[in-house]
């Protein structure tokens, strides 16, 4: 079994492409189902506003990497996506998910939300049986190591997130938010986080709209001061607010330029969604100040030097965790070969036990003794080779001997 991650992320991919290859829940299910049918053993998809990554485990890794690359282009109908796709195999793939989980590969270095997103990606694949032993262990270990690294190095001592940066950008442009009015569209994790930040800023009014009304009712219980508005009437409130934050999971635009043309006051729009919620050209309107996820990168750079120093320190810890996982992967290869050898011994034992019992009439006790003796003798023959296999450390040697055993025994 080999591992790989194939995908795109903010490092070299503009938002115009990222939003086109972002997986909705239904798309994630279709993608995993399709790729499993193509022979890939295990799949986990991590899809956020900054990355779209497919982690795979396979016996035919190179051909299945090509399968995933072609899948991206065909599934999303984006011809140019190949220009941006990155591929990492085995140890590099393992290192990548460890860095991602710890927030060390994030646009906002050390941000907190990615760990929850990685957990959700694992939960989804486990629940739908798209991942099994290898990827489940990889993601669990990555999550555990991320918690340790964040705690040990205090990378997230001050909670940092895309929402936090967006609020800081608002403060930079508006000054104090006290007495301002805001509207949040979207009551998911991002919208809820935005609300928590705004509640602390002493705004005059905060309006919340969401397509599913029940989700907003739950928010009202937690934040009784907010005012709920009907999703279909969201445009009517925009004349009366200073700030609009959008954070929906809609696959299409929910705010278009033409619907903002008559806004008279200065309106700051923070589009936290991917695909984007707000039409890009809306920012061309003189009194509309539109920001999307890529605009938040610059404001986070003030923390960058300190956080990059911490990420260099974290590298040693991550390397250690990666090496531990790779040792487990090596032992897994050996374990499969040992299992094959034991199964071959069992098959030979069953074959000869059947032959003997046809020739000699044995009672149940004698038959049981003979079975144990046959199986014990056969296992003794392979015991030393098995012990030698377990002691191998070098990956090339492991692969060489496993290949030889497989060829000799025709596994």
Swiss-Prot record:
Write down the top EC class of this protein. oxidoreductase
Q: What does this protein do?
A: Catalyzes the NADPH-dependent reduction of glutamyl-tRNA(Glu) to glutamate 1-semialdehyde (GSA).
Pfam families with a match to the protein in the record:
GlutR_dimer (PF00745), GlutR_N (PF05201), Shikimate_DH (PF01488)
What InterPro entries does the record tag this protein with? 4pyrrol_synth_GluRdtase, 4pyrrol_synth_GluRdtase_dimer, 4pyrrol_synth_GluRdtase_N, GluRdtase_CS, GluRdtase_dimer_dom_sf, GluRdtase_N_sf, NAD(P)-bd_dom_sf, Shikm_DH/Glu-tRNA_Rdtase
Q: Which residues are noted in the entry as NADP(+)-binding?
A: 186-191
Q: What Gene Ontology molecular function terms does this protein carry?
A: glutamyl-tRNA reductase activity; NADP binding
Catalysis performed (reactions): (S)-4-amino-5-oxopentanoate + tRNA(Glu) + NADP(+) = L-glutamyl-tRNA(Glu) + NADPH + H(+)
Disulphide-bonded residues: none
Q: Which GO terms describe its biological process?
A: protoporphyrinogen IX biosynthetic process from glutamate
The protein in question is named: Glutamyl-tRNA reductase
Q: Where is the active site?
A: 49
Write out the residues that bind substrate.
48-51, 106, 111-113, 117
Report the sequence similarity comment from the record: Belongs to the glutamyl-tRNA reductase family.
**SUPFAM superfamilies per UniProt:** Glutamyl tRNA-reductase catalytic, N-terminal domain, Glutamyl tRNA-reductase dimerization domain, NAD(P)-binding Rossmann-fold domains
Q: How does it assemble?
A: Homodimer.
Site, Important for activity: residue positions: 96
Pathways involved: Porphyrin-containing compound metabolism; protoporphyrin-IX biosynthesis; 5-aminolevulinate from L-glutamyl-tRNA(Glu): step 1/2
The EC number(s) given in the record are 1.2.1.70
Q: Where is the signal peptide?
A: none
Q: Which gene encodes it?
A: hemA
Q: Which UniProt keywords apply?
A: NADP, Oxidoreductase, Porphyrin biosynthesis
What does the record's free text say on domains?
Possesses an unusual extended V-shaped dimeric structure with each monomer consisting of three distinct domains arranged along a curved 'spinal' alpha-helix. The N-terminal catalytic domain specifically recognizes the glutamate moiety of the substrate. The second domain is the NADPH-binding domain, and the third C-terminal domain is responsible for dimerization.
More info: During catalysis, the active site Cys acts as a nucleophile attacking the alpha-carbonyl group of tRNA-bound glutamate with the formation of a thioester intermediate between enzyme and glutamate, and the concomitant release of tRNA(Glu). The thioester intermediate is finally reduced by direct hydride transfer from NADPH, to form the product GSA.
């Amino acid at each position: 079994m080999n591992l790989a991650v194939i995908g795109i992320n903010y490092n070299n991919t503009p938002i115009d492409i990222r939003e086109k290859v972002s997986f909705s829940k239904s798309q994630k299910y279709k993608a995993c189902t399709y790729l499993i049918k193509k022979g890939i053993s295990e799949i986990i998809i991590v899809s956020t506003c900054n990355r779209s990554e497919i982690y795979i485990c396979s016996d035919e890794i190179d051909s299945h990497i090509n399968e995933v690359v072609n899948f991206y282009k065909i599934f999303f109908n984006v011809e140019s996506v190949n220009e941006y796709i990155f591929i990492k195999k085995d140890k590099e793939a393992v290192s990548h998910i460890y860095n991602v989980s710890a927030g060390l590969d994030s646009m906002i270095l050390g941000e907190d939300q990615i760990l929850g997103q990685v957990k959700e990606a694992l939960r989804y694949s486990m629940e739908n049986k798209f991942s099994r032993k290898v990827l489940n262990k990889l993601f669990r270990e990555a999550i555990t190591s991320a918690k340790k690294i964040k705690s040990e190095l205090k990378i997230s001592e001050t909670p940092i997130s895309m929402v936090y940066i967006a609020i800081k950008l608002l403060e930079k442009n508006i000054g104090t938010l006290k007495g301002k009015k805001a509207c949040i569209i979207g009551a998911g994790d991002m919208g809820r986080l935005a609300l928590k930040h705004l509640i602390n800023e002493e705004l005059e009014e905060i309006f919340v709209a969401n397509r599913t009304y029940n989700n907003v009712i739950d928010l009202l219980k937690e934040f009784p001061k907010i005012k709920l508005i009907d999703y279909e009437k969201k445009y009517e409130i925009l004349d009366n607010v200073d700030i609009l934050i959008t954070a929906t999971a809609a696959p299409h635009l929910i705010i278009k330029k033409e619907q903002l043309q008559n806004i008279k006051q200065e309106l700051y729009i923070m589009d936290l969604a991917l695909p984007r919620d707000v039409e890009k050209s809306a920012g061309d309107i003189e009194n509309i100040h539109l920001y999307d996820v890529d605009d938040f990168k610059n404001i986070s750079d003030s923390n960058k030097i300190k956080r990059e120093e911490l990420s260099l320190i974290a590298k040693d810890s991550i390397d250690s965790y990666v090496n531990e996982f790779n040792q487990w992967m090596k032992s897994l290869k050996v374990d499969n070969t040992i299992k094959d050898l034991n199964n071959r011994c069992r098959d030979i034992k069953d074959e000869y036990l059947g032959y003997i019992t046809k020739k000699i009439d044995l009672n149940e006790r004698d038959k049981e003794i003979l079975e144990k003796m046959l199986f014990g003798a056969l296992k003794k023959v392979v015991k030393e080779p098995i012990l030698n296999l377990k002691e191998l450390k070098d990956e090339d040697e492991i692969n060489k001997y496993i290949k030889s055993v497989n060829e000799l025994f025709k596994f």
